Amino acid sequence: MVGGRAPKSPQGQRPSGLNRAAASLGIVAGVVFVAAMIFFSGWTRGILSGGHNHTGPATTGPGGMMGPGRKMGPGQTPPSAFVAVSVATVWTTPQSPRPVDRPALTNPVDIRGWLSDMTPAQQQALTSDNLNQTQALFGDRVFVVGEQGDWDEVVVPGQPTPKDSRGYPGWIPKAQLTTEPAYGALKEHAPFALADRGITTWLYRESGLSDQDLEISTNTRLPVLSRTDKAVQVATPDRGPKWLDARTVAVYEKPTDIPHPTGADLVRYAAVFVNVPYLWGGRAGFGFDCSGFTSAIYQVHGITLPRDADAQAADSQGRPVDKSALQPGDLLFYSHGSKDSDNPDAIYHVAMYSGNGEMIEAFDSTTPVRITAVRLDTDYWGARRYLDQPR
């Protein structure tokens, strides 16, 4: 994506958007926001000792956030937690992970090690045994709706699904989540830096960008604290203020400020991920599944689609497109069953049309992200367009 960056602030000054954000809040929210800024400013100066939990679970006292074994009742507002690892896999149940999955359960997490440790059969079992559901990125908010032992049952907002109106459901180890009201206030109200310039980028411990702290995925969004000409200082859930290379992110005051893309914009960015590994449930630059890939590419460009392929096909944002009229950025769907374009229930795969009779896709556990010829075989279900002006 080209452009869309907020004007740079003089070195050492906060971007004016922070002041506007505070001014636009109500009294109570404004107090929380200012307190959050003081909290993180103090952390930057080193006047805070302790108080943050880098590796611990998201708890507020004995028994965790909700007490041992409790679930949310009808009408209750679930408490928030924040992802404290570069990418947290959302599992189907606490019993789903196998011994080979341990690198994906720790803090810090080792997604690349996990992928390299799995045999092809173990990769395929993630799909066939329905072991995992999706992923959430560093700093993302999740809602905790229950818990079991060392696990929190969550829903992930920003990943729409018919399964739950609040977000995508599943389970995350408590060790990968944290709570921090100051961070939550900034997440809600401050301008944010969006990682949108490559597969992954790094957080740094200082503005000189020489001391790497944590590798994070494309589509990660973190609240902005300040800027220099070369770096953006951001708040993190449990690591204190960190810095991002300004060349790898765009800064926006609110999500609706992200420029609306063309189909060519989507395809250019999708092509960056060619040869990234396939990972069932993957939705990060470390590995994608088919619908995690398409939904992430669109979301980086300010458009939120449902998480799963069948729900993407059914989404009201999409308009049917004849195969003779495909444009870059259109999504192509494949089904083992009915080819009725009004019935997406049997859809098993989605790809993005990239032009010239080709598409880009995260196909299966033996195939990394690739550009290949469009398949218009018996499994082709139809296409949907989500842009008003796809070119």
PLM region descriptions:
Residues 50, 54-56, 61-105, 124-128, ...:
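Boundary regions of SH3-family modules and the immediately adjacent low-complexity/disordered segments
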Residues 140, 220, 329-330:
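Structural motif
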